[in-house]
């Protein structure tokens, strides 16, 4: 736990702040806004190694832009050995995104975020499958999700003509005898996390207590005798070195977070290793194609392939322009960041984490096979994969785009030696003076609850005060409420956030129906605690 007070007179050679944020992406900016709302007098600094914020994973071109709420992503609803569909993870993810919607709604109402359609747009989410077994699974999934108010309004169809009305490009040219099925959820969203980041940081820059340092790379992290942290960084343009002392240090540096946590020397970082996986997409900007597809259509991984291989045909709105992406196709580089170093993987390997990495390499051999196969894909192979979703696609309309890097978490495990984890993980010191975020999807979509989880663990005493409680509930009206158990609250907040964010209105919810699905853990802390039955990699935010 950390109790912050303003520093006294600053030493000339060392800047002193209450909070230092390393990394200029969606996570650091979200935490910065949280803390400024709760403690507007605290001094705060953000350090970013590139010459602008939101240029790595948060950049709209470096991720799939899905507002992850488990409406279409089939890997969140596995079929158990007894044939039943487990929706607990889907409920957890959806509850987390509802917190995010509420957080953004508050920021729109207070003027921190402006013009909602610049960063979020209604885009139906759909699952699309073919083959008898997959059609059967999707029908069972749809029926299981009806137990939760979070998924009311979802439609299921195995009728060629009905699906054609939803996604004509995906059905034209398809054999009508092929068994297909789809679910359709109109309340899905496409999100430009880069735009949100830029607006958040722009707001923070307007506050006198906030400082932004760009083109600044952290080179050293040491603990001071008084328990604070001294962070040394170098301006990559001038070569000047600067030290800053901080009472609380947050490392939201994406793929660079692990090495910085290791540099701090905290023992909690020793249990983790990382494995980088990149992603590429086929892109079209042809208006004749783009204007006839409005959906994020997720498929199902092929037999024997890991969930990360799930392809999707996505409508995107990036910087005001509508496009379509198809992918992802896995790529490999030893870089942990798109703008990183080829030595990143080797530099993060230590005597503490090398064995967990080797164990994962053996236990997750299907993933290794999948990555090897992806690296062998030709342009023709990728185009043929697209045609499974868009039968009449034309090569000349599409180009290949290299998106961002995702660093998958490998954690030491006493039973297995090491496990590959899906999702995000907060790693913090015992005294709570330093914390960092590792992992990937659903990441950005649940930035608000993940950062609220940081506040719950690092600033536990502060969060218990009436002042913080009142402010948090002002921003998150359902804080502490399990939405899955409260259909009335789901509908109330759905309506409020849809109106503020200029999104499609939600479906009516039958308040007499009591959900039978297992409730998720409180959304605020759930994201970093997620434990899927069989975790594997995910290369899209």
Curated annotation (Swiss-Prot):
Reactions listed under catalytic activity: (S)-malate + a quinone = a quinol + oxaloacetate
Entry EC number(s): 1.1.5.4
UniProt-annotated stretches for the region Disordered: 520-541
Pathway(s) it belongs to: Carbohydrate metabolism; tricarboxylic acid cycle; oxaloacetate from (S)-malate (quinone route): step 1/1
GO terms of biological process kind: tricarboxylic acid cycle
Top-rank lineage group of the source organism: Bacteria
UniProt feature coiled coil, ranges: none
Keywords for the protein's UniProt record, in alphabetical order: FAD, Flavoprotein, Oxidoreductase, Plasmid, Tricarboxylic acid cycle
Pfam families, A to Z: Mqo
Matching InterPro entries: FAD/NAD-bd_sf (IPR036188), MQO (IPR006231)
NCBIfam families reported for this sequence: mal_quin_oxido, PRK05257.1-1, PRK05257.1-4, PRK05257.2-1, PRK05257.3-2, PRK13339.1
Family (UniProt): Belongs to the MQO family.
Protein name as catalogued: Probable malate:quinone oxidoreductase
């Amino acid at each position: 736990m950390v109790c912050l007070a303003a520093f006294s007179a600053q030493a000339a050679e060392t800047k002193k702040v209450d909070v230092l944020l390393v990394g200029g992406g969606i996570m650091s900016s979200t935490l910065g806004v949280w803390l400024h709302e709760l403690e507007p007098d605290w001094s705060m600094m953000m350090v970013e190694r590139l010459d602008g914020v939101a240029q790595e994973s948060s950049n709209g071109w470096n991720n799939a832009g899905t507002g992850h709420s488990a409406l279409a992503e089939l890997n969140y609803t596995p079929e158990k050995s007894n044939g039943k569909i487990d929706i607990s993870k889907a409920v957890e993810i959806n509850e987390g995104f509802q917190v995010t919607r509420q957080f953004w709604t508050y920021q729109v109402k207070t003027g921190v975020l402006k013009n909602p359609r610049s960063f979020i747009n209604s885009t139906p989410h759909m699952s699309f499958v073919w083959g008898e077994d997959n059609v059967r699974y999707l029908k069972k999934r749809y029926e299981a999700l009806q137990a939760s108010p979070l998924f009311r309004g979802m439609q299921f169809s195995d009728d060629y003509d009905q699906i054609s009305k939803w996604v004509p490009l995906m059905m034209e040219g398809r054999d009508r005898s092929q068994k297909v099925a789809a679910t359709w959820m109109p309340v899905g969203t496409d999100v430009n996390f880069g735009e949100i980041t830029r607006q958040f940081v722009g707001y923070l820059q307007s506050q006198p207590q906030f400082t932004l340092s760009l083109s600044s790379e952290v080179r050293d992290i040491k603990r001071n005798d008084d328990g604070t942290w001294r962070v040394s960084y170098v301006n990559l343009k001038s070569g000047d070195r600067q030290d800053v002392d901080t009472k609380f240090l947050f490392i939201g540096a994406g793929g660079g977070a692990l090495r910085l946590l290791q540099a701090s020397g905290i023992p909690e970082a020793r249990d983790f290793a990382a494995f980088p996986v990149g992603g590429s997409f086929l892109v079209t900007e042809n208006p004749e194609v783009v204007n006839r597809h409005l959906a994020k259509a997720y498929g199902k991984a092929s037999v024997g392939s890991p969930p990360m291989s799930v392809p999707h045909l996505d409508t995107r709105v990036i910087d005001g322009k509508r496009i379509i992406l198809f992918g992802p196709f896995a790529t490999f580089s030893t870089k942990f960041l798109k703008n990183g170093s080829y030595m990143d993987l080797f530099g993060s390997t230590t005597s503490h984490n090398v064995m967990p990495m080797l164990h994962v390499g053996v236990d997750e051999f299907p993933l290794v096979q999948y990555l090897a196969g992806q690296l062998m894909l030709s342009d023709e192979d990728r185009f043929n994969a697209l045609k499974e979703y868009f039968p009449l696609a034309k090569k000349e309309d599409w180009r290949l785009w290299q998106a961002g890097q995702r660093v998958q978490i490998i954690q030491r495990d006493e039973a297995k030696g090491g496990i590959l984890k899906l999702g995000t993980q907060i790693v913090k010191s015992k005294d709570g003076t330093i914390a960092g975020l590792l992992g990937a999807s659903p990441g950005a979509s649940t930035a608000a609850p993940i950062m609220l989880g940081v506040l719950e663990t690092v600033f536990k005493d502060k969060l218990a005060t009436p002042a913080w409680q009142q402010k948090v509930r002002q921003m998150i009206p359902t804080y502490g409420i399990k939405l899955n158990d409260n259909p009335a609250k789901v509908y109330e907040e759905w309506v409020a956030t849809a109106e503020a964010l200029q999104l499609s209105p939600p479906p009516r919810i039958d308040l007499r129906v009591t959900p039978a699905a297992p409730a998720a853990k409180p959304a605020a802390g759930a994201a970093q605690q997620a434990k899927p039955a069989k975790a594997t990699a995910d290369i899209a935010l």
